[in-house]
Amino acid sequence: MAQVHVQGWVAAGFEEVEEEFARNFTKRKQTGAACAVYIQGKKVVDLWGGVSDPYSGTLWQEHTMVPVFSSTKGFAALAGALAVSRGLLDYEEQVGSYWPEFAVNGKERITVRQLLSHQAGLSTVDTLQLEKFADLDTSQVANKLANARPEWTPGVKHGYHAWTIGWYIGELIRRVDPRGRSLGRFFHEEIASSLDAEFYIGLPASVPDARLAQVRGINSPAQILKHIHEIPFSMLLGFLNPRSLTARSMVDPKRLVANENFNRREMLEIEFPSGNGIGEVRAMASIYGEFAAGGKKLKLSKSVLRTLEAPPELPLSGAYDHVNRTKLAYSVGFWKPIEGHTFGSSHRAYGHPGAGGSFCYADPDFELGYAYGLNEIGGYMDNNPRENAVRQAVYRCLK
């Protein structure tokens, strides 16, 4: 067996998780990754391995921090849930009651629930004129979003708000927080700091570069050929049609969100709540673990936890996502399990995958928080075979 740098710890009974994680490096060509699991508030898996910098060969260390791309959306949604729990926000209220400028151009009756569940028809970014990294910060784009016009009748169907969902959550948080904090500050001060968890939406200047994993993504013809089979064919067709909702919601002509740009501090230090969250993977698992175990430290209300754990309320036309071009289930900012995209042990699970195969979620059935982060970004979202293998091993250990 090839030598591989895998370190960390697993509790008794979870040895198979460590074995499967090691196989990701010896058999499945994982570059660098970390995985952590918390159950009932206690850490049972804390593993890391490979290299944090695929260019220099620097080894992944215990406190390496890694970007998790769209998994960031789940943490933004957790901040939204905390705001609901504290009575600052109501999922059933119209967005315009918190953000009057939003209530124009057919958006007057959109509820917070519809917006956070990707049903509002506000996914497209092709008219936003995003030219530089700073333009991706919520503070810079919110006024443009207020004037947007829905692409479909809100509530009739859904489509992944790939870039915009985090901005909308961020602006709502700023408007309802009595202190007017940004989402990144609200999350850090009310959730991450309370749980002693290092995860940021907006990286502080105090974090040294040496702790940051370097991402290697799809940035050359050779890389495209290597990973093209990982991207669903229907989505590829969408990317190739510039008039499709897929292209208009996801294609980035200026390449601002190209994978390699997440190696640049000017990208990581802004607040782009749909995609630039970064932290220790154990921190991600511990945060979801707090929600999965009832949120006692954060004093979460039972009603908001019931909402997060409830089956998704699908739009009138059903589960087909008109941006991702597959059947998906969303609820108040999170992915929910659905056939073909399952995770957790029942419909009560909630979380979010990210580009290349990161995944962070809560499984209330086991009071479990799970996180997997990596730095080799291919075409997978939630069906990365490396992450899946480790996740399945976790559940075999729970039987």
Task: Briefly describe each language-model feature range.
Residues 37, 41-42, 67-90, 115, ...:
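Alpha-helical scaffold elements that line and support the substrate/ligand-binding pocket
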Residues 5-68, 90-93:
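Short, conserved catalytic-motif segment at the N-terminal edge
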Residues 61-63, 148-155, 167-170, 264-273:
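Flexible glycine/proline-enriched surface loops and loop-helix/loop-strand junctions
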Residues 217-281, 310-366, 399:
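Active-site Gly/Thr loop motif
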